[in-house]
Amino acid sequence: MKFEDNEMTPSMENTINTAVIIEKPKKTTKSINSEIFLDPNKTKVAVLDIETSSLKSDFGIIICAVLHTLGTDEKYKVCAIDLANKDLLSEEKALLEVLNTELENYDGVVTYFGSRFDIPFIRTRSLYHGLQPPSKKRSLDLYFTVKRTTNPTSRRLERINDILRISDPDASPDKTRLGMKEWNGVVFNRDSKMLDYIVEHCIADVKILENAVWRFKDFLPERIMRC
C-alpha cells in the first residue's frame, strides 16, 4: 500500500587580542510563529482528514486518510483499505504504516477537531497494531479557532463551509454527507462504490479545511504548539 512524492594560548612576549566565536546550539522550541507555520517555503504542513468506521478507536478502524501539503499545488495523497482483502485489520495496519511514514515527512499538521479525534484515533490504532505512532508535531486544530472567534448555531465544518461559500462559492466544494448507509456499506457489505464515495468525501473535507484556514488566517493563535 502506498499514497497516490580551540583553544588559543597567547605568547607572553606578543599577546594577540583574539575574539573566539563560540557557536551556540540551536534552540529548539515546542511552538512556532503562525505566519512561519503557514509559509510552505519555511514549514511543510499537512492538511489531514481521516474517515473511520466508528467514533471510538478501540472498536473502529480507519477506512481512509487524505493528506495535502498546505499552500501548494501538490496532488492530494490518498490511502484507503482494500475491500478485496478479507482481513480488514491487516489492511488498516498497512494503511497506518504508509500514513505514519508519510506524516514523518511533515513539520506540522492542520485538522478540524483533529486534536480530539483524528490524531488520537491514529495513535490508538497504531498502538493496537504494534506500530510506532506518529511523533508529536506542531498542530493547528482550526475547530478551536472557529469556536473562539465565531458563534454560529453549529461549529461543524459543514456549517462553517456553508457560511464561507455564501461570499465565495467557488473557493471550496459543497460538503457531502456521510451516514449509516455509507459506513455500513463499506464495513459489512464491502461495497466499493460506497468506499469511493467516502474517499471523495474525505478529499472534499481536506479542500474545505484548507480554504477555511486561509479565511481564518487573521484569527489563528500567534504560536502553533506541538501536540
Please state what every model-predicted region is.
Residues 49-51, 118, 141, 205:
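Acidic active-site catalytic centers that drive phospho-/nucleotidyl reactions
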Residues 39-40, 56-60:
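A short catalytic or substrate-binding loop motif that flags glycine-/basic-rich loops and adjacent residues
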Residues 110, 159-227:
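Acidic, Mg2+-coordinating catalytic module of metal-dependent nucleases/exonucleases
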Residues 1-44:
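N-terminal accessory regions of nucleic-acid-interacting proteins
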Residues 43-54, 202:
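Two-metal-ion RNase H-like nuclease active-site motif
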Residues 76-154, 158-159:
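Conserved DEDDh/DEDDy metal-dependent 3′-5′ exonuclease domain
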Residues 59, 122-124, 214:
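Short amphipathic alpha-helical segments
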Residues 51, 58-71:
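Acidic, metal-ligating active-site segments
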